């Protein structure tokens, strides 16, 4: 099995390197990741300039583009063989609920999915991670399971892992996305030269975090696994919109 690894934290990120070390024991891996931190890049593609690809001393490819660029480039032109799987991560911080809209980690997996490759995004439940090994060990077990019994395509799974030692994990749970409160306001400040600048505010706290959500699962030290889809259609409102337009 050949696995394409990517992320949004950059090719040098500890989570990606630990994941690569573990998965190399059970599969052939190739890493194509951004040259710098591209957290929050979502599904953006670079269309206004060419992309450059370089190879680090450890064999990882790094690209001056977004996470989506990396996977798109790898699958459609860079690699001699198509990967059997795309794994994005391990992200330093959660990608739960509304996070999935902004996440470059999830976006990299989504691009693999759109290109017909079974894809997985894996993130830790908080920033400042201490236990990347926990997620890496779980992903090894998931890959082994997939090698033995392949899940029918299409596959796009968003995985969030509690930041605890592996022996404290209380199993897995198939979940739905929760929801956060709206983000904190932007932070306004002034540079030493008197220029006004703004920082994007922090993500909101969990709002919908009840039973069955990704937020609830990780709070109970369970690994959250949420199947995702691309279709954003709000089916329940189609008739309502038709009636509104007919007025």
UniProtKB/Swiss-Prot annotation:
Binding locations of a divalent metal cation: 8-9, 39, 91
Gene transcribed to yield this protein: surE
Lineage, highest ranks first: Bacteria, Pseudomonadati, Pseudomonadota, Betaproteobacteria, Nitrosomonadales
Catalytic class of the enzyme: hydrolase
Keywords for the protein's UniProt record, in alphabetical order: Cytoplasm, Hydrolase, Metal-binding, Nucleotide-binding
Molecular function (Gene Ontology), one example: 5'-nucleotidase activity
EC number: 3.1.3.5
General function of this protein: Nucleotidase that shows phosphatase activity on nucleoside 5'-monophosphates.
InterPro entries: SurE, SurE-like_Pase/nucleotidase, SurE-like_sf
Name of the protein this chain belongs to: 5'-nucleotidase SurE
Disulfide bonds: none
Chief localisation class: cytoplasm
Cofactor: a divalent metal cation
Superkingdom field: Bacteria
SUPFAM superfamilies according to UniProt: SurE-like
Pfam families (alphabetical): SurE (PF01975)
Similarity section: Belongs to the SurE nucleotidase family.
A GO-annotated cellular component: cytoplasm
Cell compartment(s), UniProt: Cytoplasm
Note describing how the cofactor binds: Binds 1 divalent metal cation per subunit.
Signal peptide per UniProt: none
NCBIfam families found in the cross-reference section: PRK00346.1-3, PRK00346.1-4, surE
Catalytic activity: a ribonucleoside 5'-phosphate + H2O = a ribonucleoside + phosphate
